[in-house]
Amino acid sequence: MTSYTSSILSQISSPEDLKKLSCSELSLLAEQIRHKIISVLIKTGGHLASNLGIIELTIALHYVFSSPEDKFIFDVGHQTYTHKLLTGRNIEEFERIRHDGGLSGFTSPLESAHDLFFSGHAGNALSLALGMAKATEKSRTHVLPILGDAAFSCGLTFEALNNIHTDLSKFIVILNDNNMSISKNVGVMSKSLSQWIHHPKFSLLSRKLERSLSKIPRYGKSIAKCSHKISTCLRSLVCPIPIFEQFNLAYMGPVDGHDIKALVSLFQKVRDLPFPILIHVCTKKGKGLEIAQENPTKYHGVKANFKLTAEDKLLPTIQPQLTYPDIFGKTVCKLGEISPNLHVVTPAMSLGSRLETFKGTFPERFIDVGIAEGHAVTFSAGIAKANTPVICSIYSTFLHRAMDNVFHDVCLQNLPVIFGIDRAGLAYGDGCSHHGIYDLSFLRAMPNMIICQPRSSIVFQQLLQSSLHWQRPSAIRYPNIPALQGDPIATDINLYRDPGLGEILSQGEDVLIVGLGHMCSAALSIKLQLLSHGISATVVDPIFIKPFDNNLFSILLMHHSKVIIIEEHSIRGGLASEFNDFLATYNFKVDVLHFGIPDSIFSHGDKENLLQRVGLDVDSMVKRILTYFNFRTKKAPSNKLSIV
């Protein structure tokens, strides 16, 4: 990597500092930012390829426009590392990005006035920008939504496009195209025609001409429409994307997204045009790092503690333990062999949910619908209606976007769609927009729905296999953490063929501890610590949140008056809410202590510290248990821990 003796980056404390630089200095700044991003992400992890691809574009935008007076709205927001470096963030906080004490990996209004929204989900930037443009249309404010090409697989983006009006000024859509295949234009005539037709003056003159023609008595509107069609046809000769013109956006481009001089020149020309514009910018993901540029999907996001070897390959320092997504991917592949008609649907999460092997083995039965969660759910419902088994693999945080589809198209029809809900629980480095801690709140209310969560890899595999027999909508939620490879008890697969049965992991006398999914491990650790205080606990895994095992808990509450619920979910609407409904229905009077995610917004952080912040680390829970129940240390029971 290049060594810089005089850092321009260190002199940038706000976007205004950019305006003092020459074009050559802006290019040097881009290389310094690229060097900084690579060197930091090797240590911290984060979104690599997308941030390397948008550096020059971000610099040019901040050079021409004036944030925060002008409004930059980044779709998704994971590609904003350059934006952060140019808008006065603390460089030490950037070097800890996505970790405790560091910057968010997405835009965050808590960090800067230059960040307008908390971000993390795709497809909403255009709607947000249109709202802001409407509210500020009488001011001098420019509104610039910056969208990746993936945003155009979202229905919400097209809903917003359909609402754009021709009289909307200072509204400039930036399409950051790092994936579309644009046919190359051939020949001098084509190049000249393209430069003329896509020049801002051509757009301005054609719009003025159409308005003037429309004022001609009687035939004006017809003549204006004809003029618009001629203009559109001329554009379509050299541009394969005339669709934007149909949505009242004057199309300009494509332009090289790594040519700062060309970008600055174009932005300066279009800045004050009195109609909405879309600028098509072509960039390369992973720009400046060969391995990331060659495989942008693999290097879209990298984990912490990666290192660059002399061979320019990113290698993990240690062999990681299998995670729940790893187990999911492997098990689904096995089920694909057992069930020759099994289909798998995902909304652009094939790599994250470890479905690449299934995709390669059964390509005709694997469907990636793009960032279109609602369609993924309803499409899966259509497959299920045709008596074909289907798994819809989706992140918990993205399932929110398809709530109506889950109700209307799956549960109301009682179709056996199996939802593999990935990233259930805290998202750690990804932060508040990605925490999977709300899905139980709405899934519990869905008619016909089965909901469960495994405590170990063994139970996970057995639940997935059993779900093919349930013949009802089902949701198996799981976190993105190393999976418990063993299991506290020998599990019989037939136990899960009839959903709704919980399991006793360990018996005691003084208190009942109920742990959901991977929190069973925390429950067993708490049991051991309580034993040192002479307190004996029963530990139970409900496995199924819905249907709830009323019979098992009715028996257990005959012998326990103190209950502890532990779940990595919001305290509103999760396992504890289901348990409280059970208590009210059967009129049990017991003392309940609930550990869950408080009803607040929690940002990013490392696993250990974030668990401490929400009160879900074992030591904090033990202290609170002893205080809450006023337990006093007594002589530990002589009998050893019994496992049944």
From Swiss-Prot:
SMART domains: Transket_pyr. It catalyses: D-glyceraldehyde 3-phosphate + pyruvate + H(+) = 1-deoxy-D-xylulose 5-phosphate + CO2. One of its GO terms (cellular component) is cytosol. Pfam families: DXP_synthase_N, Transket_pyr, Transketolase_C. Keywords: Isoprene biosynthesis, Magnesium, Metal-binding, Thiamine biosynthesis, Thiamine pyrophosphate, Transferase. Thiamine diphosphate binds at residues 78, 120-122, 150-151, 178, 373. Its EC number is 2.2.1.7. CDD domains: TPP_DXS, TPP_PYR_DXS_TK_like. Pathway: Metabolic intermediate biosynthesis; 1-deoxy-D-xylulose 5-phosphate biosynthesis; 1-deoxy-D-xylulose 5-phosphate from D-glyceraldehyde 3-phosphate and pyruvate: step 1/1. Its cofactor is Mg(2+); thiamine diphosphate. Belongs to the transketolase family. DXPS subfamily. Catalyzes the acyloin condensation reaction between C atoms 2 and 3 of pyruvate and glyceraldehyde 3-phosphate to yield 1-deoxy-D-xylulose-5-phosphate (DXP). This is 1-deoxy-D-xylulose-5-phosphate synthase.
